[in-house]
């Protein structure tokens, strides 16, 4: 949760919220876009030959704490793991999230602060920022024992699951995903023809 001198500004979504249909964790969203047809657009990519599955063998490959609120946002079906963030649901809070495309999340503010501390070679405060966020998601904060950049990438992976933001963190941190992906050319975006001089 974020606080100011007058009290709370934001609180984190809970596991109960997810159960009630808050599949975008909207309490954590600071800014989002909207698309009224989002569920319709996503439908062809779920439970078909074109399914968008997560690159993991098991949910524990992604989440190191089974109580992690974000772990409820994935589903194991037919030996494949899917993000449920863009799937239709009839739960109570579904109408609030069905058209949301999160752009800035509260967690990102913690990542920015953690990166700042890391740039000042203050590993203790850098990991503390990640620990605060982990605690808000019901994760044990004491599991942050590895390299800061690796820990940050792991947290970003959990935070932005299925949203496309992880790509930019890999680029920014000059890291490769932990699975076989072929060439580094996948991280090089083509230059538009109108920018060739």
Regions found by a protein language model. Name each.
Residues 1-48, 52-54, 58-197:
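Acidic/polar-rich alpha-helix caps and helix-coil junctions
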């Amino acid at each position: 949760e974020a606080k100011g001198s007058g009290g709370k500004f934001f609180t984190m979504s809970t596991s109960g919220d997810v159960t009630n249909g808050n599949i975008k964790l909207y309490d954590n969203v600071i800014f989002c876009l909207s698309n009224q047809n989002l569920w319709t657009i996503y439908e062809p990519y779920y439970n078909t030959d074109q399914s968008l599955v997560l690159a993991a063998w098991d949910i524990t490959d992604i989440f190191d704490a089974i109580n992690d609120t974000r772990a409820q946002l994935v589903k194991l079906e037919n030996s494949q793991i899917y993000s449920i963030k863009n799937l239709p649901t009839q739960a109570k809070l579904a109408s609030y999230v069905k058209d949301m495309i999160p752009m800035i999340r509260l967690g990102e503010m913690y990542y920015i602060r953690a990166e700042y501390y890391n740039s000042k070679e203050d590993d203790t405060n850098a990991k503390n920022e990640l620990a605060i966020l982990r605690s808000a998601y019901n994760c044990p904060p004491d599991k942050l024992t590895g390299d800061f950049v690796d820990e940050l990438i792991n947290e970003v992976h959990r935070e932005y699951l299925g949203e496309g933001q992880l790509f930019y963190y890999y680029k920014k941190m000059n890291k490769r995903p932990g699975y076989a992906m072929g060439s580094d050319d996948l991280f090089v975006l083509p230059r538009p023809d109108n920018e060739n001089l």
